[in-house]
Amino acid sequence: LGGHCIPLDPYYLAWKAREYDFATRFIELAGEVNNNMPYFCRSVISQAMNHGLQKSLSGSRILILGVAYKADISDTRETPAEKLVELLRTAGADVAYHDPHVAEFDGMRSVALEPEAYDCVVIVTAHTSLDYAGIVERANVVVDFRNATRGIESRKVWKL
C-alpha cells in the first residue's frame, strides 16, 4: 500500500502510543509487512517468469501497469511501484511503465500500452480505464497484484 497515509501513519501512531506506555508491536509488524511487500512481489514475478516463460528476471522486459499509489489518480507519494521497479532493475530486468495518470516517474516516461512487446506485464495499480481482458489476450505473462483480471480465465495470469 502506498500514499501519504497508510505507510506512514502507523509509525507515528506507534511512536505516540509508546509515550503512553502502550504496546505497539502489532502496529509495527503491520508496517514491516507493508514495507516488505515489494520484495514478495518481485519473488512472485520471478516465479511467473520462470514457470510461464522459462525465463529469469535478468534480461527480461517488464511492463509495470500503474505507478500511482491508488487507482485513477496521479499521486505517486510512497507508491510501492518505486521500490518494485528498483528491485526488478537490480535483478537485471529492463523495466518500463504505463500509467494513464502519471506521465513521468522515477526518471522514466509512460510508454504506449503494448503488452505483447514485454515478457511480463505487472498490474501494480488497477486504473479503471484499462482494458484488462485485452491486455491479458496480448500479453505473454500477467502478474496481477490488484485482482484487476478477476473473471478472466487464462493460464497467463498469476495472482497473489
PLM feature spans:
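Structural/interface elements that position substrates and couple domains in central-metabolism enzymes
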Residues: 1-160
